[in-house]
């Protein structure tokens, strides 16, 4: 009996043609760390990594500097890095009532740590009520985190209007694109998104365990990196390198 897979909101299947072969080829023919030495295979690995960063910036309309594309284990890690790296006790965070637990649970942890959290209401279709959302913004509002699209309701949020409101008030906007990336085109700069968090295993048709975020300089300045360790750069220093992408260490 032929099986028809309908759970693509959880993870895509089958993956895009060539994904499995590309992974196999990399493991068998390259398979080394980036930035750890100067022999040919490490140069090939570095070039592959740089190329993916450039592709991500083009795909998401993030500008031309690939160092602002940071690799993580997926959208959950990316959202945690942004939310917990940008917010401090006394700050104010706004999320919507439609958020996935990848946003709602970090928000709950941050609230317990002294960050004020507001939940912006949505209408019966799950669309953000823009006027009520804007009224929640205060002088202490530092970050807004919103999902772009929902795999529960099918709602696509009016991200351009949300971005315009945030920019008008000088508030950073981070977007959970888990259910949007790969499904439809969008431009971070035009939408005034400061950080776009993505995962590889849904609409981008890649494997599980990969993802990241692409950000602008405003978000970079706001972030305190949460993870420290070896980067293959400035190894004599006990401080993390100040430059991107090594500053935001995960899978650099």
Question: Predicted segment positions?
Answer:
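Pyridoxal 5′-phosphate
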Residues: 1-250
């Amino acid at each position: 009996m032929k099986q028809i897979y309908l759970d693509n909101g959880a993870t895509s299947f089958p993956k895009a043609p060539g994904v499995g072969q590309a992974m196999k080829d990399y493991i068998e023919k390259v398979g080394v760390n980036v930035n750890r030495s100067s022999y040919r295979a490490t140069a090939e690995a570095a070039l592959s990594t740089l190329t993916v960063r450039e592709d991500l910036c083009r795909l998401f309309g993030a500008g031309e500097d690939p160092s602002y594309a940071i690799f993580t284990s997926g959208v959950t890690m990316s959202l945690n890095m942004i939310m917990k790296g940008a917010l401090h006790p006394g700050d104010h965070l706004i999320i919507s009532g439609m958020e996935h637990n990848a946003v709602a649970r970090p928000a709950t942890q941050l609230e317990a740590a002294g960050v004020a959290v507001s939940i912006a209401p949505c209408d019966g279709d799950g669309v953000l009520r823009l006027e009520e959302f804007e009224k929640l913004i205060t002088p202490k509002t530092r970050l807004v985190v919103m999902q772009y699209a929902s795999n529960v309701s099918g709602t696509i949020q009016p991200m351009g209007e949300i971005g315009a409101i945030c920019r008008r008030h000088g508030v950073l906007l981070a977007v959970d694109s888990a259910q949007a990336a790969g499904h439809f085109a969008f431009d971070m700069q035009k939408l005034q998104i400061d950080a776009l968090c993505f995962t590889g295993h849904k609409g981008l048709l890649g494997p599980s365990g990969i993802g990241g975020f692409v950000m602008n300089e405003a978000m970079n300045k706001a972030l305190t990196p949460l993870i420290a360790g070896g980067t293959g750069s400035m190894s004599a220093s006990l401080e993390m390198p100040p430059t991107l992408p090594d500053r935001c260490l995960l899978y650099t």
